[in-house]
Amino acid sequence: MKCPFCHTPDTSVIDSRVSEEGDRIRRRRRCPHCDKRFTTYETVELRLPQVVKQDGNRAEFDREKLRTGFVRALHKRPVSAEDVEAAMNRVVQKLLSLGEREIASHKIGEMVMGELYKLDKVAYIRFASVYRSFQGAADFDDAIRELQGSDSRKEPDKP
């Protein structure tokens, strides 16, 4: 690693310790050229997968788009900002745990629907109406029947 003081390209590690949380490593380094010491931290870099759109285009995952989807579906519903944030974090964590480089946008939509189903059934129907492109009242009736017929402990069947 380059020395931040004299910019010599090679430094040596004189001490390494794992943090109490176990999620990073603290390293004390020494520059052989200027003899100064400094600390670095090593952490795991987790990357969210690229989103493959329905038209085949690819885009970086955008947490703000995820937030917008939740906020629109939950507009004027009795769900706290903390619950929305927790649901978003669960979606992001699922994406990270997949370990994939790419994910189809419809899979993210299904994850969002699953979280909305747990949070608020009206928001679930709102999101489903846009996500599944409801064409009329019959589509709403089907979705409501699906909700009414499903066990309260499980998510409704996904297409």
From Swiss-Prot:
It comes from the Bacteria. The keyword Hydrolase does not apply. Its cofactor is Zn(2+). Residues 49-139 form the ATP-cone domain. Keywords: ATP-binding, DNA-binding, Metal-binding, Nucleotide-binding, Repressor, Transcription, Transcription regulation, Zinc, Zinc-finger. A zinc finger (unnamed) spans 3-34. Binds 1 zinc ion. GO terms for molecular function: ATP binding; DNA binding; zinc ion binding. The keyword DNA-binding applies. One of its GO terms (biological process) is negative regulation of DNA-templated transcription. Belongs to the NrdR family. Negatively regulates transcription of bacterial ribonucleotide reductase nrd genes and operons by binding to NrdR-boxes. This is Transcriptional repressor NrdR. It comes from Nitrosospira multiformis (strain ATCC 25196 / NCIMB 11849 / C 71).
